[in-house]
Regions:
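Juxta-kinase regulatory segment immediately upstream of eukaryotic protein kinase catalytic domains
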Residues: 1-19
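Broad phosphate/nucleotide-binding scaffolds in NTP-utilizing and phosphate-metabolizing enzymes
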Residues: 2-4, 148-150, 245
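Conserved ATP-binding subdomain of kinase catalytic cores across diverse folds
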Residues: 16-149, 153-154, 169-177, 188-195
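C-terminal catalytic region of ATP-dependent kinase domains
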Residues: 65-66, 187-281
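Alpha-helical scaffolds flanking conserved acidic
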Residues: 162-167
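Short, glycine/acidic-enriched loop or turn micro-motifs at the edges of active sites
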Residues: 174, 181, 199
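Hydrophobic residue at the +6 position relative to the catalytic HRD Asp in the kinase catalytic loop
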Residues: 182-186
Length: 281
């Protein structure tokens, strides 16, 4: 990969490789509910790993129109870019080996077989973790009590981290129905990324997330200023961009959620029957 001064890959170069590179499928990610492939994109001497989800491989869902998940993933990325929070990895829709589909840059994580040699996972709890019942480390927030598969009582916790707090606000805005713990990735670059946004941006309330630790807490002023800018952009070029991938009703619903958060700047509470995605990890 083309290096930059700190020795890491240049994000702009990786974006270009993902957009224009020749794709080779390395393998299938079988834990995914839809057809999902790990690919290597080559452009000249440059290469990048990407996740490829062909539209033809999308499993039918009762509450989301068939063939729309790729557009929702791209729309979530566009919202992430507009917010300036760098939550969603670079995402496009392009042709691939199994037809047109969503393409997203792979996130190298510490300890991953695709990461750099020497990148080891940090010690201690993960950003989202299951711990023995009542064990809440400093800097963590409890979400719920549950039983694991062995029948032992556990506590679901997540870090009280600004990166996760922004992701929680992002999920409220895009109405994310599937924020599992495994959809939160710590990159070797120190960023925290959110992936798998195919079931988002519905007009009906479908928020399901493991990031409930801030329920009922006020949203800070800096975040509200960012949400206000998003609200305004949705009535301009951003709204037009999104309408190419989701319906105008869904764009209006996104705008309405931004307005609602600004009018009542408090994180929502889990008052629905199924507020946690299953499985949570």
């Amino acid at each position: 990969m083309t290096p930059i001064p700190n020795g890491g890959p240049d994000p702009d170069v990786l974006d270009e490789v993902c957009l224009r590179g020749e794709l080779t499928v390395i393998g299938r990610i079988r834990s995914a509910s839809n057809a999902t492939f790990l690919c290597e994109a080559h452009l000249g001497e440059r290469q990048a790993h990407c996740v490829y989800k062909p539209i033809a491989g999308e499993a039918p869902l009762w509450d989301f129109p068939h063939g729309t998940l790729a557009g929702r993933e791209l729309s979530a990325y566009l919202v992430s870019v507009a917010l300036g929070w760098n939550i969603v990895p670079y995402t496009i829709i392009r042709d691939g080996p199994a037809g047109r589909g969503m393409m997203q840059l792979w996130v190298d994580q510490p300890g991953s077989s695709l990461g750099e040699v020497g990148d080891e996972p940090a010690s201690g709890p993960d950003l989202v973790d299951l711990l023995p019942a009542g064990h809440i480390p400093p800097g963590y927030l409890p979400v719920l009590q549950a039983y694991d598969y062995a029948g032992d009582e556990v506590t679901l916790v997540h870090a009280d981290d600004i990166r996760l707090r922004r992701m929680a606000v992002f999920d409220v805005l895009i109405n994310n129905a599937d924020r599992k713990g495994g959809h939160i990735l710590c990159g070797v670059d120190g960023q925290v990324y959110g992936v798998d946004h195919g079931v988002s941006l519905h007009v009906e309330d479908k928020l399901r997330t493991v990031l409930w630790g801030w329920s009922g807490k006020p949203v800070d002023d800096e975040t509200l200023e960012t949400v206000a800018r998003l609200r305004d952009q949705l009535r301009g070029e951003l709204g037009d961009q999104l309408c190419a991938h989701i319906t105008s009703r869904e764009v209006d619903a996104l705008h309405a959620r931004a307005v609602a958060l600004l009018n009542n700047p408090v994180m929502p509470t889990p008052d629905r029957r199924r507020p946690i995605p299953w499985p949570a990890f």
